[in-house]
Amino acid sequence: MDKKSLYKYLLLRSTGDMHKAKSPTIMTRVTNNVYLGNYKNAMDAPSSEVKFKYVLNLTMDKYTLPNSNINIIHIPLVDDTTTDISKYFDDVTAFLSKCDQRNEPVLVHCAAGVNRSGAMILAYLMSKNKESLPMLYFLYVYHSMRDLRGAFVENPSFKRQIIEKYVIDKN
C-alpha cells in the first residue's frame, strides 16, 4: 500500500463508525472571530453577545435577519454523499481568514451545525495548519471538535474530501 492510500485508510478508519454523538445545540468559538453553529444559532445571531458582521449560511434555504446589520452570505449546499464541497474550500477558507485578520466575527452554520458547516470549519483549520504532520493535525482537530460539540463532520464524503485536499495532497 502506498503512503497516500495508507493515510487515507487510517484517517477514514479512525474517524468512522464511532459512537453516535448528539447534535450540538450551542455555538462554538473556533478562533478569535470564527464561530460554528446551527440554524437556531443563526436566527439568534442578532441578539447574541457576539456582534457578528457576517453569517455564512450553508443550508439550502435563503433567509434574512430582520432589524439586523449582519451580512448573510449564502452558499446552498446539500448534505449528502454526492455533493462536491471541496470546490468551495479555497473561497470559504480565504473569507474566514480575512474575518479573523480584520476582527470581524462570523458565524458559519448549516441546519444542525454538523456536516456542511463542520466541514468548512475543519477545512479552514486545516488550511491554517503549518505543521509537517497534517494527518495528526486532522485527527487532533476532528476529535477535539467532536469532544467539544458532539457530532462533527459525520458525512463520510465530506471527511474524504477534506482528507484528500489537506492531508493526501500535502504529502
Swiss-Prot record:
Q: Which reaction does it catalyse?
A: O-phospho-L-tyrosyl-[protein] + H2O = L-tyrosyl-[protein] + phosphate; O-phospho-L-seryl-[protein] + H2O = L-seryl-[protein] + phosphate
Q: What class of enzyme is it?
A: hydrolase
Tell me where in or outside the cell this protein is found.
Virion; Host cytoplasm
Quote the EC number.
3.1.3.-, 3.1.3.48
Please list the residues that make up the active site: 110 (phosphocysteine intermediate)
Q: Result of mutating residue 110 to S?
A: Loss of activity
Region labeled Dimerization — which residues? 1-27
Q: Which InterPro entries match?
A: Dual-sp_phosphatase_cat-dom, Dual_spec_Phospatases, Prot-tyrosine_phosphatase-like, Tyr_Pase_AS, Tyr_Pase_cat, Tyr_Pase_dom, TYR_PHOSPHATASE_DUAL_dom
**GO biological process: what's one of them?**
symbiont-mediated suppression of host JAK-STAT cascade via inhibition of STAT1 activity
Q: The Tyrosine-protein phosphatase domain covers which part of the protein?
A: 23-171
GO CC list: cytoplasm; host cell cytoplasm; virion component
Listed SMART domains = DSPc, PTPc_motif
Q: Which UniProt keywords apply?
A: Host cytoplasm, Host-virus interaction, Hydrolase, Inhibition of host innate immune response by virus, Inhibition of host interferon signaling pathway by virus, Inhibition of host STAT1 by virus, Interferon antiviral system evasion, Late protein, Protein phosphatase, Viral immunoevasion, Virion
Name the family.
Answer: Belongs to the protein-tyrosine phosphatase family. Non-receptor class dual specificity subfamily.
What does the protein in this record do?
A: Serine/tyrosine phosphatase which down-regulates cellular antiviral response by dephosphorylating activated host STAT1 and blocking interferon (IFN)-stimulated innate immune responses. Dephosphorylates the OPG144 protein.
Quaternary structure annotation from Swiss-Prot or TrEMBL? Homodimer.
PANTHER family registered for this protein in UniProt: IP21249P (PTHR45961:SF6)
The entry's protein name is Dual specificity protein phosphatase OPG106
What organism is listed for this UniProt entry?
Vaccinia virus (strain Western Reserve)
What high-level taxonomic lineage is stated for the organism?
Viruses, Varidnaviria, Bamfordvirae, Nucleocytoviricota, Pokkesviricetes
